Amino acid sequence: MAQNFTKLNPQFENIIFEHDDNQMILNFGPQHPSSHGQLRLILELEGEKIIKATPEIGYLHRGCEKLGENMTYNEYMPTTDRLDYTSSTSNNYAYAHAVETLLNLEIPRRAQVIRTILLELNRMISHIFFISVHALDVGAMSVFLYAFKTREYGLDLMEDYCGARLTHNAIRIGGVPLDLPPNWLEGLKKFLGEMRECKKLIQGLLDKNRIWRMRLENVGVVTPKMAQSWGMSGIMLRGSGIAYDIRKEEPYELYKELDFDVPVGNYGDSYDRYCLYMLEIDESIRIIEQLIPMYAKTDTPIMAQNPHYISAPKEDIMTQNYALMQHFVLVAQGMRPPVGEVYAPTESPKGELGFFIHSEGEPYPHRLKIRAPSFYHIGALSDILVGQYLADAVTVIGSTNAVFGEVDR
């Protein structure tokens, strides 16, 4: 039987190959530098304009969800670092928050203060990282150098607290592993000053830069309807003009006690999204400045008290036989949450990050599902890129701030 060579399956199954001097099909990635070997876009072009974009993912798939169903609840925590690896503390917290909701644990106030500080510090580090590499993609190399210098100070603080700079593993189910080191808050105050100065410097380089604005304004426009239909969240959603932040709508930890604003865009373009990242850095500084005096007013416990699910403090394990046996059982066999299911959303630097956990009362989740914001934002490229010039594709992809560790799970 004669074969039909007008189609190539599966990637090109929806493309009709008809001769047109003005149209062509271009594979953007995975070798392209801006895709980091993790994204392939099949672009249909008419001249220099994109008329169709088909994202293809899966190049970084590691089976993170299935791993979670074959590990005990505590064993899985370090794996969450490898989702959005530019803001790993947010992943740690989102997973811990879901398990704690399932277990109905009460978290000590000091642990809540430390967690919220770490989350906002992590948000600033992630935002300044995005701004620096986005500027580098567009061609502003100086911003990359200045921003990375300031980011290093933030990573030093994370290293002083948990010993790691990238994959922090700084949160535990039930609290935090460590109290803040001596003089750590003084270093944090100094970092906030450094961040303010860095932000002013970057704004001086970019805000009124004619080339920067020409490359970003009216490029990659996301309308409110498009944002809602694709399930966008975070700055991708707020940039379109919709004021939705889970820290305000469904507050967790201490956010309901804190005074902060939710910046919202007007035009939904790449420049709006850049501006929102800068404004959110201000809000994170504002939040941390409210949390620092709260720390001194809290008591010393940093882990929840529940022998069925949480190990006793280390000093008790070393001196009390019952605490040692309970710790051995939790480590060797794992905790056994009650039968049920839970979905707990959080506001990560990229958007809504949530974990769905279905428990059958066993040491392993029966089903674990990760709702990662970058997955939805990459899918939306098939709408956002249509009508854009090929030269603007890198700008649009960069403005989504997608990390493929959480896209390919």
From Swiss-Prot:
Coiled coil: none annotated. InterPro entries: NADH_Q_OxRdtase_suD, NDH1_su_D/H, NiFe-Hase_large. Keywords: Cell inner membrane, Cell membrane, Membrane, NAD, Quinone, Translocase, Transport, Ubiquinone. Pfam families: Complex1_49kDa. Its EC number is 7.1.1.-. It catalyses: a quinone + NADH + 5 H(+)(in) = a quinol + NAD(+) + 4 H(+)(out). GO terms for molecular function: NAD binding; NADH:ubiquinone reductase (non-electrogenic) activity; quinone binding. NDH-1 shuttles electrons from NADH, via FMN and iron-sulfur (Fe-S) centers, to quinones in the respiratory chain. The immediate electron acceptor for the enzyme in this species is believed to be ubiquinone. Couples the redox reaction to proton translocation (for every two electrons transferred, four hydrogen ions are translocated across the cytoplasmic membrane), and thus conserves the redox energy in a proton gradient. HAMAP family: NDH1_NuoD. This is NADH-quinone oxidoreductase subunit D. It comes from Helicobacter pylori (strain Shi470). The gene is nuoD.
